[in-house]
């Protein structure tokens, strides 16, 4: 069976694919409501090196849903802040908070209801279920800060690792995990992005560090083997019959 994993950062082409799969009953969409970016723009020259991009079309799913969310009643700032507002309304933790327009409910060939109004609403919802501190930690882990930390740590302490056996690296935990946590917390503090380490997120931090080590030493495939172990979306897909 086909599962497509999406969240609020999924935009444009990924939404076209997710919408087509959902509308044709070919698979399940797992995650959270997507960004809602479905405009077609054409770049036109004005002369002297100047150019302007004109919106010439919109992307629609097979049932007729417009992927683009409304923007005509909001300012540019409000438009890009809409995803942040989903945290305020509770949508990130509760799918019942997703705004539904009754006039924009569509039906697939097999009778499943799908929803328009901007973005792709998933079939199976994955809640953030996170506090503000946890969301902040996720932001840091998702930034390039952890990648830089791993690069510097490997440069200084590569002698502490044995990378000859990839499978052994995958199966074993990092050497001196507490030392890694302390070093990363100090590194974040020096970069003015303090991270709060708790029992709950310690495993995620170590897993992310290990994944980025694998990316720099081995390859992208090994990175994802490690990173996906704690990925809520992947776990939910694996649990789905």
Label for each model-derived stretch:
Residues 1-49:
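Cleft-lining beta-strand/loop regions that shape enzyme active-site pockets
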Residues 8-12, 34-37, 59-62, 74, ...:
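Solvent-exposed loop/turn segments at secondary-structure junctions
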Residues 24, 49-54, 101-103, 121:
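Active-site lining segments that contact anionic ligands and/or coordinate catalytic metals
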Residues 66-67, 71-241:
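Conserved functional hotspot residues or short segments at active or partner-binding sites
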Residues 42-46, 58-59, 104-108:
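Short acidic-hydrophobic surface loop/beta-edge motif
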Residues 3-11, 30-33, 45, 57, ...:
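Hydrophobic alpha-helical scaffolding
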Residues 1-7, 20, 28-30, 51-58, ...:
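Soluble periplasmic/extracytoplasmic beta-strand elements of cell-envelope proteins
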């Amino acid at each position: 069976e086909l599962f497509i994993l999406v969240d609020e950062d999924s935009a444009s082409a990924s939404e076209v694919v997710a919408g087509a799969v959902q509308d044709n009953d070919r698979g399940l969409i797992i995650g959270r409501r997507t960004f809602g970016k479905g405009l077609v723009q054409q770049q036109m020259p004005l002369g002297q090196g100047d150019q302007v991009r004109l919106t010439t079309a919109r992307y629609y799913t097979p049932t007729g849903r417009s992927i683009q969310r409304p923007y005509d009643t909001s300012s540019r700032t409000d438009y890009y802040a809409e995803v942040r507002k989903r945290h305020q309304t509770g949508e990130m933790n509760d799918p019942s908070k997703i705004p539904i327009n009754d006039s924009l409910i569509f039906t697939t060939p097999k009778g499943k209801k799908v929803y328009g109004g901007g973005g792709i609403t998933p079939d199976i919802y994955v809640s953030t279920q996170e506090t503000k501190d946890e969301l902040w930690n996720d932001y840091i882990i998702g930034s390039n800060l952890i990648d830089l930390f791993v690069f510097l740590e490997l440069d200084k302490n590569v002698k502490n690792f044995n990378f000859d056996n990839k499978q052994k690296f995958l199966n074993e935990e990092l050497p001196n995990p507490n030392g890694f946590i302390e070093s990363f917390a100090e590194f974040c503090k020096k970069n003015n992005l303090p991270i709060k380490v708790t029992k709950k997120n310690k495993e995620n931090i170590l897993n992310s560090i290990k994944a980025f080590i694998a990316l720099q030493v081995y390859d992208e495939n090994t990175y994802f083997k490690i990173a996906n172990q704690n990925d809520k979306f992947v776990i939910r897909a694996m649990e789905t019959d």
